[in-house]
Amino acid sequence: MSNIYIQEPPTNGKVLLKTTAGDIDIELWSKEAPKACRNFIQLCLEAYYDNTIFHRVVPGFIVQGGDPTGTGSGGESIYGAPFKDEFHSRLRFNRRGLVAMANAGSHDNGSQFFFTLGRADELNNKHTIFGKVTGDTVYNMLRLSEVDIDDEERPHNPHKIKSCEVLFNPFDDIIPREIKRPKKEKPEEEVKKLKPKGTKNFSLLSFGEEAEEEEEEVNRVSQSMKGKSKSSHDLLKDDPHLSSVPVVESEKGDAAGDLDDDGEDESAEYDEYVDGDEKNLMRERIAKKLKKDTSANVKSAGEGEVEKKSVSRSEELRKEARQLKRELLAAKQKKVENEAKQAEKRSEEEEATPDGAVAEYRREKQKYEALRKQQSKKGTSREDQTLALLNQFKSKLTQAIAETPENDIPETEVEDDEGWMSHVLQFEDKSRKVKDASMQDSDTFEIYDPRNPVNKRRREESKKLMREKKERR
């Protein structure tokens, strides 16, 4: 695959297509196909491709888009007419990820383009290759083909281009046009036909006369109430059930007997108009209403008591938690004190024993415990202490080296812990001597003396071997 990339010329220009399948980076061959690249870049700058769909998908072959109508037969170039094809000997349809112009014939290029999904040798010298998909965005390009298509190679749910962004424009003289897109004609608003009001035929009803009288009364009241807000007293002046005297509600906390008495007092004003049955009905209604109010008050009071109980319960739990914390802390402190007392008793008992080895062990233990207590905790003080110990060790080393002479280095004993400080590592130098060709010394030239007995013996042996070889032949 690398030999294919090497054969392709370098690119000059870059565009980013933001699609519903992901971003797609396109690098352009603006020197090899200048007209196609100029057309593509200017259409991207003019947002010509925004919200256009990929209307044609051939799996394993191409994905085509760039038609604002979405039919496959639309789209115009920036030149106002189709422009010529631009073929190049180093640009071939030999792999996926190539971007080329779609056309209906030779020299019929507009705004539509397509991506290749594989090798397509049959398209060579028929379509202008002007770009390639780069990087990992090639996988987003492949996702464009992962849709269901019909018999006409049109996807059921096509992907679309959301927007275009020109990252590098090799043409500095491009001036985007102001394209006036035709507005979609809104459908004519349907005229709502007012349905004529149907006339009510009361003669068909058994109680037609009464219903007709009620209808006339309602119409008369509605006509008189237009533009005004009135109470029920104003609306129903002739209603015997309503009194012109305002009713004063008794307190909600009164007993049921008081409510009945108040109802009797108020009903005395219109006994002339109301029958006994109607009076009982009114009493029942008022009693029900007041019962509802009292039940609501009881509920609210019960809820308040529940809230108070829950608050008091939570306070008790908090107090118990605080008390438990105090008890735990006290028990912990008591445990620490008991352990300290037991340790003191043990130390006193151990000191009382006269054994020398045990006494020495205790002294060493106390010594290390004292050192451990002197060590500070982690932090800046601990770091300072570590640096101080390091400097102390360095000074000790330099002092040991200065005290011991370089030439006379005595062998240290195993028990001498400080002998290693002044010890110097020495070993035999076994490195080979490298001969310099420019320097001539006694070892430069090889000396061969034929009179040397060793050389004589070697010559005789070699002659003997040669004779034996000849005899064998």
UniProtKB/Swiss-Prot annotation:
<feature type="compositionally biased region" description="Basic and acidic residues">
    <location>
        <begin position="276"/>
        <end position="287"/>
    </location>
</feature>
<feature type="compositionally biased region" description="Basic and acidic residues">
    <location>
        <begin position="305"/>
        <end position="348"/>
    </location>
</feature>
<keyword id="KW-0175">Coiled coil</keyword>
<feature type="compositionally biased region" description="Basic and acidic residues">
    <location>
        <begin position="360"/>
        <end position="372"/>
    </location>
</feature>
<dbReference type="GO" id="GO:0003755">
    <property type="term" value="F:peptidyl-prolyl cis-trans isomerase activity"/>
</dbReference>
<feature type="compositionally biased region" description="Basic and acidic residues">
    <location>
        <begin position="231"/>
        <end position="241"/>
    </location>
</feature>
<dbReference type="InterPro" id="IPR020892">
    <property type="entry name" value="Cyclophilin-type_PPIase_CS"/>
</dbReference>
<feature type="coiled-coil region">
    <location>
        <begin position="307"/>
        <end position="378"/>
    </location>
</feature>
<feature type="coiled-coil region">
    <location>
        <begin position="206"/>
        <end position="230"/>
    </location>
</feature>
<feature type="compositionally biased region" description="Basic and acidic residues">
    <location>
        <begin position="177"/>
        <end position="193"/>
    </location>
</feature>
<dbReference type="InterPro" id="IPR029000">
    <property type="entry name" value="Cyclophilin-like_dom_sf"/>
</dbReference>
<feature type="compositionally biased region" description="Basic and acidic residues">
    <location>
        <begin position="426"/>
        <end position="438"/>
    </location>
</feature>
<keyword id="KW-0597">Phosphoprotein</keyword>
<feature type="region of interest" description="Disordered">
    <location>
        <begin position="177"/>
        <end position="386"/>
    </location>
</feature>
<comment type="function">
    <text>As part of the spliceosome, plays a role in pre-mRNA splicing. Probable inactive PPIase with no peptidyl-prolyl cis-trans isomerase activity. As a component of the minor spliceosome, involved in the splicing of U12-type introns in pre-mRNAs.</text>
</comment>
<feature type="compositionally biased region" description="Acidic residues">
    <location>
        <begin position="405"/>
        <end position="419"/>
    </location>
</feature>
<dbReference type="GO" id="GO:0071005">
    <property type="term" value="C:U2-type precatalytic spliceosome"/>
</dbReference>
<dbReference type="InterPro" id="IPR044666">
    <property type="entry name" value="Cyclophilin_A-like"/>
</dbReference>
<comment type="subunit">
    <text>Part of the activated spliceosome B/catalytic step 1 spliceosome, one of the forms of the spliceosome which has a well-formed active site but still cannot catalyze the branching reaction and is composed at least of 52 proteins, the U2, U5 and U6 snRNAs and the pre-mRNA. Recruited during early steps of activated spliceosome B maturation, it is probably one of the first proteins released from this complex as he matures to the spliceosome C complex. Component of the minor spliceosome, which splices U12-type introns.</text>
</comment>
<feature type="region of interest" description="Disordered">
    <location>
        <begin position="399"/>
        <end position="473"/>
    </location>
</feature>
<dbReference type="GO" id="GO:0071013">
    <property type="term" value="C:catalytic step 2 spliceosome"/>
</dbReference>
<dbReference type="InterPro" id="IPR002130">
    <property type="entry name" value="Cyclophilin-type_PPIase_dom"/>
</dbReference>
<comment type="similarity">
    <text>Belongs to the cyclophilin-type PPIase family.</text>
</comment>
<feature type="modified residue" description="Phosphoserine">
    <location>
        <position position="347"/>
    </location>
</feature>
<feature type="compositionally biased region" description="Basic and acidic residues">
    <location>
        <begin position="458"/>
        <end position="473"/>
    </location>
</feature>
<dbReference type="Pfam" id="PF00160">
    <property type="entry name" value="Pro_isomerase"/>
</dbReference>
<keyword id="KW-0539">Nucleus</keyword>
<feature type="compositionally biased region" description="Acidic residues">
    <location>
        <begin position="257"/>
        <end position="275"/>
    </location>
</feature>
<keyword id="KW-0007">Acetylation</keyword>
<feature type="domain" description="PPIase cyclophilin-type">
    <location>
        <begin position="11"/>
        <end position="166"/>
    </location>
</feature>
<dbReference type="GO" id="GO:0006457">
    <property type="term" value="P:protein folding"/>
</dbReference>
<feature type="modified residue" description="N-acetylserine">
    <location>
        <position position="2"/>
    </location>
</feature>
<protein>
    <recommendedName>
        <fullName>Spliceosome-associated protein CWC27 homolog</fullName>
    </recommendedName>
</protein>
